Amino acid sequence: MQFDYIIIGAGSAGNVLATRLTEDPNTTVLLLEAGGPDYRFDFRTQMPAALAYPLQGKRYNWAYETEPEPYMNHRRMECGRGKGLGGSSLINGMCYIRGNAMDLDNWAKEPGLEHWSYLDCLPYYRKAETRDIGPNDYHGGDGPVSVTTPKPGNNPLFEAMVTAGVQAGYPRTDDLNGYQQEGFGPMDRTVTPQGRRASTARGYLDQARGRPNLTIRTHALTDHIIFAGKRAVGVEWLEGESTIPSKATANKEVLLCAGAIASPQILQRSGVGNPELLRQFDIPVVHDLPGVGENLQDHLEMYLQYECKEPVSLYPALQWWNQPKIGAEWLFGGTGIGASNQFEAGGFIRSRAEFAWPNIQYHFLPVAINYNGSNAVKEHGFQCHVGSMRSPSRGHVRLKSRDPHAHPAILFNYMSHEQDWQEFRDAIRITREIMNQPALDKYRGREISPGTECQSDAELDEFVRNHAETAFHPCGTCKMGYDEMAVVDGEGRVHGLEGVRVVDASIMPQIITGNLNATTIMIGEKMADAIRGRQPLPRSTAAYYVAGGAPVRR
């Protein structure tokens, strides 16, 4: 089999590339996905409110675990990643958050990455998006990704939480993806007007599936990239239960879009990485590139949970006898509780003046429950997810076996810097202050977790060690740049090699301030133009907020 391009991974970036590259009818593309189809009648992936379900099994989730995390009481922590058409956009929380403009401007300070500034990237965010309330300078109106903005009249706890943030002295913002991210306001979500999850399989691949120049292979587990000297010439994979490898040739390029955990694994299995690691597994070294799998970053978060004195939380929706009605409303009308991910309000703040842009993120949820659906509180409650955004801690992803079925060694080194501890102590104390504002007086009962007895630095630190969880935002393991630990250049081309690029969240030099999916899609759109040899979209001229010396709160 011969194709112009072979794309490894049908996730948030891979599906963008597959769709855009096959717009050229003379360009042939093979899209390889280790998981299965995105079954449209499976409520677990299609109903926004059911977002916890895909994380509980292994049909749609790689269900990785970390090595024992040394600063987290040696816990092995979850590292869920999407498996199936859509990748992690098939199982994520559907929060549409782009990050802060300053994140991208910070990337662009590095020589060679100047074209990754916010104003260079904003046109690609807009190109990808159709926002239900219409386009403007910041939002698109005819892109493949459906974005829904929360409407007035939703759960009263959302507005109360936003108002509480404002009463605590922080700004209100009408659009966390617009002029000003900093502050509290409604949180957009990737949900269609029919109340379905807007994964990239639905938004992008649905346009492209019927094209004769696109071949999609599911249950196709990539073993390695085939090199002739320093040039990538093809891919070898295992299909279904077969132990006999399948092969295809790439006439132009191999595009690695397997995500921050799998992309470095595939490079390492292909002979690209740290030679000392590769020799442990008798892998012939194609290219010495020590940064492959290093620079691993993530967002860590905690839940602060409260009893709700008014019966307005989603607790009744957790009772089995209420779920048939909720399911029917969603299935036949695309409406009701089932049509929302329930993360409809949130915010970004600076915990201290030393931070030039927000370093803490909030998600508000009108029920007290773990993200993966476990440990639901057996009463009306609500919670605030809070976590730091740009931890200096760095980890790695490293092979443990040549077997493509084997999971790698994943270590984030969560909380390995004093800044991490300072930020999380500040976050808990600020959150308690917000939760004690008048806007929440009629709703706020006792603090369920951590509990009011948890006050000192030592007590807060122990709570974080035992209870903080991943926000499922790994990135950075094939970082873009030109220093000795960079893996790809500003166009995604792997340093020292020909015919192979990485296009996914692994190329982010530094993690962004917010959820990763929207920016990963943007990366796919921007790289698609580069791969096609097109001129970049004209830079935006939109204004954006820079705090400068502004106080962190009134």
Curated annotation (Swiss-Prot):
Pathway: Amine and polyamine biosynthesis; betaine biosynthesis via choline pathway; betaine aldehyde from choline (cytochrome c reductase route): step 1/1. Its EC number is 1.1.99.1, 1.2.1.8. GO terms for biological process: glycine betaine biosynthetic process from choline. It catalyses: choline + A = betaine aldehyde + AH2; betaine aldehyde + NAD(+) + H2O = glycine betaine + NADH + 2 H(+). Involved in the biosynthesis of the osmoprotectant glycine betaine. Catalyzes the oxidation of choline to betaine aldehyde and betaine aldehyde to glycine betaine at the same rate. FAD binds at residues 4-33. It is an enzyme of class 1 (oxidoreductase). Signal peptide: none annotated. It comes from Klebsiella pneumoniae (strain 342). Belongs to the GMC oxidoreductase family. InterPro entries: BetA, FAD/NAD-bd_sf, GMC_OxRdtase, GMC_OxRdtase_N, GMC_OxRtase_C. Its cofactor is FAD. This is Oxygen-dependent choline dehydrogenase. Pfam families: GMC_oxred_C (PF05199), GMC_oxred_N (PF00732). Keywords: FAD, Flavoprotein, NAD, Oxidoreductase. GO terms for molecular function: betaine-aldehyde dehydrogenase (NAD+) activity; choline dehydrogenase activity; flavin adenine dinucleotide binding. It comes from the Bacteria. One of its GO terms (cellular component) is membrane. The active site is at residue 473.
